[in-house]
Each structure stands twice: as C-alpha cells, then as structure tokens.
C-alpha cells in the first residue's frame, strides 16, 4: 500500500512503526461555531482512511482533538455574553451529532486543549530548559532559528516564510518568526497558573501535547487540511522533536484538499459557509459521502447543488441494491467477487483512490441489478457489495420515518400484499397500495425480477 507523504512530497510504501498497530492523529475543530461541510469533507476522508486500514488488519488508535480555547472563541463568547467554555461545549455537542449523522466512526479519544494544560506546561518548561524557548513578560516563544530542519514540511526556508507571510512586529520576540508556546493573560480571558505567571496555551503546542500524551513520541499518521501545513503542522514538528529528541515525530503526513464555493475556499472568515446541518436537511449522509469520495482526498472540491443532486441519485441507486431481499425462487448466479475485491483494494492501496473504489461499487451494483432483472441473484455478490460500501462508510439505509423508525419492513410487507392481491386478480386494491405509497413518497418499480421501491426526491 502506497500513500502520499507531504513530508517527502512523494508516494511511499506504508510501513507502520510497530507491526500491525497504527497511531493516527487528526487535527480537530476550533468549536467557535457550527461545523460546516468543509469539516465534513475532511473527516469523511480520514474516516475512510481509518476504515480501510482497519479492513487491512491494522489496529488503529485514532485521536482527534478539540481546540476549545483560542482568540476567536474568546471574542465570540464575549460578544454573546457567555463563558468561552460554554460556547465551545455547545458547538462540540453539535459537531459530535453531525459526525454521527454522517456515519463517521468516533475517535478513540477527543482530548480538549483546556484539559491538557499540565502536559502543555511540562513541554514548554522542557523546551526552555533545552534552550529552544524563552520567556518574556509572561509569554513563552520558540526559537525557530535553533530548530534543525525548520520548514521541512512546507518545503520553505525561513527567508521564504518571511517573504510570504505578514509577520507582526513584536518587540518581545528575538526573531520575527518565533511563535508563542504560552501567552500571557489579558483582561477578560481564561487563564491558568504557570511558572511564567497567569496565561493560556498557544495554538500549536496544544496538538503536540495531546499527541504526545495519547500516542507517544512518534506516530504513524498525522492528518489535517492543507491549510494547516504551515504554520500549524510545521510548528508541531518543531516543538515535538525539540522536546522529545525523537525524529521523526510523524512518519506520514496526510493532508486533504479544501472545499471551495465557486473560486473561494469555504471558511468562517469568508462567511460563505454551508453548515453540515443545512446540507443534511437537503441531502442524505450517503450523498455527502459520495460527493466527497468521488475525488481524491488530496484534491480541492467545489461545492455545488448540481454535484450534490447527482450524488444523491447515485446514493439512491446503491440503496436499492442494498435493500434487495433474497428471493428463494430466483436462480443463484455467479459473480466474480474476487475480481471486484481485487479491483477495490488495488485502488485503495494506491493512496486511497476512493473515486475508483466507488466506481467499482457502482459496477458491482449494476451487475447485481442486471442479474435480478433476469430473475437471478448472487448471495456472495450482495454480501461483498455491502462489505465494500461499509468500508467507504455508506450506510445505504433506504428510508426512515420522521420518528427514526425503519420503515423498510413495512413497505416490503405492503409490496408482498400487493403481489398476493394481483395474483388474486384484486387489481383495484393492489393499485390502491401503489397510489398510497406514491402519495407517501415511495415509488414502486415492477420488472421481470420483481418489485423494487425507492424514495422519491
């Protein structure tokens, strides 16, 4: 299996640090507001990567943090007249609900930055002791010029970073690119006791502390959006390797592309967000997954209603295949499941090519539909179809009532009753079942292989 490593800039054979164990850390959200579909894109991609590694037999330990203290959270909370912790916890709850609705596997741990302050202070103190950091007026900064290989992830020198960034002049700093590990307290901000006085953690140190605590000094995979490569992930490497003395801090760096709305990145700062809640009110979770997985995780993706509508139609086709019931009267037909499985794994082994893997599932769906249309069935083919769909996190649940009850068994019962009525030549009653279901939004389609149903959009 080969994966693209941002650190080397090329495809590399995936070899975990420890046999069949994979330690995976993915940067979580800053819960300043409701999660948007840019978040959905990122976490769907890393969920599928995790699912596939598990399918391959690896034991994956997956950590995803919450940056629950930050300048923007403080500003928004102050504007609303509430505590930053209240705002953060409220949005964390919304986020976790959204992840469940998208069928994203929960992380093994969701550490919060505010709960890791003792570990953060330990690391900052260690960096000062080793000469990599310095304290001034209650704040602590990292000396980037002392960091061996600083810029190796973003593939830039300090001079290029200086030229390409707006660096605020700060008389506290020894060098303009030095970054804060600990920030001195300001009036109205949450703060913690530290050897340097009251203050709070800097952004970058939080992820180093959480990955070190839950995964150790070295991890296999670190993921996040491409907008985090610099400065966040670059600074994570600097802090972690300087503190532990162990290199590399991360063996494989994986970064997903960003979601665009037209030509612009979708982001809070641009105010062009579509929340996950809004998207799920119009489209199914399967449609959102198909939309995301139809492109490489490394590529940018452009949001459009047309693309989501096409994904919903594709999801509906797959749901009908998944909902098919075994008919004992149909002839068992052979499907080359080995070839389909090999195709799927070949694509996924090539840097998680979900687009081609998804196409394989659609091809299998078409073959199963053709077989049923000829009054046949493939038990093995149907089983593989559901297995591969599950690796991509497609639930393919056909329909639910507003109360959350699965209505599929009731619809199947009505279809069976309609079939019996037609055999008994009670066509008026049979037609009444069809029209009643149609009114309820359920469309019946009759064929030589039997009757299938789908939810009308």
Swiss-Prot record:
Zn(2+) binds at residues 27, 207, 232, 236. A motif ('HIGH' region) lies at residues 29-39. Its main location: cytoplasm. The keyword Nucleotide-binding applies. Monomer. CDD domains: CysRS_core. One of its GO terms (molecular function) is ATP binding. Belongs to the class-I aminoacyl-tRNA synthetase family. A motif ('KMSKS' region) lies at residues 265-269. It is found in: Cytoplasm. Keywords: Aminoacyl-tRNA synthetase, ATP-binding, Cytoplasm, Ligase, Metal-binding, Nucleotide-binding, Protein biosynthesis, Zinc. Binds 1 zinc ion per subunit. This is Cysteine--tRNA ligase. GO terms for cellular component: cytosol. Its cofactor is Zn(2+). One of its GO terms (biological process) is cysteinyl-tRNA aminoacylation. It is an enzyme of class 6 (ligase). ATP binds at residue 268.
């Amino acid at each position: 299996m080969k994966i693209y490593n941002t650190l080397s800039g090329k495809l590399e054979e995936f070899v975990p640090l420890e046999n069949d164990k994979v330690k995976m850390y993915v940067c979580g959200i800053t819960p300043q507001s409701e999660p948007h579909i840019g978040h959905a894109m990122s976490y769907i991609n890393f969920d599928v990567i995790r699912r596939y590694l598990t399918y391959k037999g690896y034991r994956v330990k997956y950590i995803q943090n919450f940056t629950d203290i930050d300048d923007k959270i403080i500003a928004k909370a102050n504007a609303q007249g509430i505590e930053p912790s209240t705002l953060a916890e409220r949005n964390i709850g919304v986020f976790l609900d959204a992840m469940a609705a998208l069928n994203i596997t929960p992380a093994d741990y969701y550490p919060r930055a505010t709960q890791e302050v003792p570990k953060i202070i330990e690391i900052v103190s260690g960096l000062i002791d080793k000469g990599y950091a310095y304290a001034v007026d209650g704040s602590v900064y990292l000396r980037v010029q002392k960091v061996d290989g600083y810029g190796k992830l973003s593939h830039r020198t300090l001079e290029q970073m200086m030229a390409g960034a707006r660096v605020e002049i700060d008389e506290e700093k020894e060098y303009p690119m030095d970054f804060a590990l600990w920030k001195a307290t300001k009036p109205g901000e949450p703060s913690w006791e530290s050897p340097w006085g009251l203050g709070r953690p800097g952004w970058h140190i939080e992820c180093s502390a959480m990955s070190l605590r839950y995964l150790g000094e070295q991890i296999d995979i670190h993921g996040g959006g491409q907008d985090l490569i610099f400065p966040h992930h670059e600074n994570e490497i600097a802090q972690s390797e300087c503190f532990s003395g162990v290199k590399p801090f991360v063996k494989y760096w994986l970064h997903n592309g960003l979601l665009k709305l037209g030509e612009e990145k979708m982001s809070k700062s641009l105010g062009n967000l579509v929340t996950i809640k809004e998207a799920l009110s119009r489209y199914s979770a399967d449609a959102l997954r198909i939309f995301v997985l139809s492109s490489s995780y490394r590529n940018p993706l452009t949001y459009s209603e047309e693309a989501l509508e096409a994904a919903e139609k594709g999801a509906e086709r797959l749901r009908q295949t998944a909902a098919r019931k075994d008919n004992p009267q149909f002839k068992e037909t052979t499907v080359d499941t080995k070839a389909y499985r090999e195709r799927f794994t070949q694509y996924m082994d090539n840097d998680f090519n979900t687009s081609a893997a998804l196409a394989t599932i659609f091809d299998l769906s078409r073959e199963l539909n053709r077989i049923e249309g000829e009054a046949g069935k493939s038990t093995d083919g149907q089983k593989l179809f559901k297995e591969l769909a599950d690796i991509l996190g497609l639930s393919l649940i056909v329909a639910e009532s507003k109360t959350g009850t699965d209505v599929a068994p009731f619809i199947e019962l009505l279809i069976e009753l309609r079939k019996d009525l037609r055999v008994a030549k009670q066509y008026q009653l049979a037609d009444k079942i069809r029209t009643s279901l149609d009114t309820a939004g359920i469309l019946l389609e009759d064929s030589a292989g039997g009757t299938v149903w789908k939810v009308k959009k």
